[in-house]
């Protein structure tokens, strides 16, 4: 069907509806059970790494980093897990907080705490503000947008370009003190697979937002992946922000979901040590520790 429906007569529309309905019914009769979820590894990929399920088989192996990982404690995660993610992201181990299987949980927690308590440099919890705005490079990841939408944030669309978000527009929009943050997937951005250019990354790190608690949510989910050609690492966004005079502006997230087992991996929230100290005080009330056995 190449003709616009609005140009068809009522009779032609009825015929078209009957034809489409017949094709739809034929597909239903096939009884297909298709999982159309995007980003979900196949069984072959899961099987390739399933040996990790039997790595730990003796309680003696649960002694690591001077502690028994089966017990309570070590809210921010095992030092060895922090070191692993620091190597993957290019940041420092002390800038890493280790979470559970979903980095999305850490992202949600970050926004939630901004609303209930405010961030390190917030003048008030966001829930007390008249208006909270957020920059959403689009097209983008729907689960990111659902988080900010669920808090009633006014989301502002920023068009994507072949090199990342339209930075001229971003630099203009952040002059509004009500603009509190921006979602970013710097590598293989959903759904177009755009990779931010080095210039775009530097301009983002050098932003001068009017809001003192502007929050750059940097979802580096594909930090170790490369579709073609040699692996090209990104400059560490934490270092770039620090060098640009914005040490506390960014929270970076990643996980092993696309590396090992999505349902049983570990995640990381990387930020300045000042940011992590502030967040850990809030999270200490919420929990004692994530799954350290899995981290091991």
Language-model regions: role of each:
Residues 2-76, 80-81, 86-87:
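N-terminal "arm"/small-domain region of PLP-dependent enzymes with the aminotransferase-like
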Residues 42-45, 188-191, 260:
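Short acidic, S/G/P-rich loop/turn micro-motifs used as interaction or catalytic elements
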Residues 46-50, 147, 227-231, 263-266:
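Short aromatic-enriched loop/helix-cap "lid" or pocket-rim segments at secondary-structure transitions
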Residues 61, 67-212, 223-245:
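Conserved core of the PLP fold type I
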Residues 99, 238-296:
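Conserved core segment of the aminotransferase class I/II
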Residues 133, 215-216, 251:
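Hydrophobic "anchor" residues on beta-strands that sit immediately upstream
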Residues 220:
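Walker B catalytic acidic pair
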């Amino acid at each position: 069907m190449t003709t616009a429906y609005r140009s068809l007569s009522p009779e032609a529309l009825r015929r078209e509806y009957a034809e489409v309905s017949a094709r739809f019914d034929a597909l239903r009769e096939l009884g297909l059970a298709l999982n159309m979820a995007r980003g979900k590894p196949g069984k072959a990929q899961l099987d390739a790494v399933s040996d990790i399920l039997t790595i730990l088989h003796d309680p003696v192996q649960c002694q690591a980093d001077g502690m028994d990982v089966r017990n309570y404690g070590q809210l921010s995660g095992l030092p060895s897990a922090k070191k692993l993610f620091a190597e993957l992201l290019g940041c420092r181990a002390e800038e890493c907080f280790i979470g559970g299987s979903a980095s999305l949980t850490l992202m949600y927690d970050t926004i939630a705490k901004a609303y209930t308590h405010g961030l390190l440099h917030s003048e008030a919890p966001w829930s007390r503000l008249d208006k909270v705005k957020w920059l959403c490079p689009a097209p983008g990841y729907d689960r990111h947008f659902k988080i900010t939408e669920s808090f009633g944030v006014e989301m502002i669309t920023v068009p994507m370009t072949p090199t990342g978000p339209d930075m001229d527009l971003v630099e203009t929009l952040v002059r509004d003190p009500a603009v509190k943050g921006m979602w970013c997937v710097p590598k293989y951005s959903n759904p177009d697979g755009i990779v931010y250019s080095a210039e775009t990354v530097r301009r983002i790190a050098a932003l001068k937002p009017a809001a003192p608690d502007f929050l750059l949510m940097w979802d580096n989910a594909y930090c170790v992946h490369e579709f073609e050609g040699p692996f090209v690492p990104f400059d560490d966004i934490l270092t770039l922000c620090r060098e640009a005079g914005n040490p506390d502006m960014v929270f970076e997230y990643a996980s092993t979901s696309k590396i090992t087992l999505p349902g049983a991996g570990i995640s990381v929230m990387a930020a300045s040590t000042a940011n992590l100290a502030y967040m850990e005080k809030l999270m200490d009330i919420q929990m004692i520790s994530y799954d350290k056995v899995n981290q091991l």
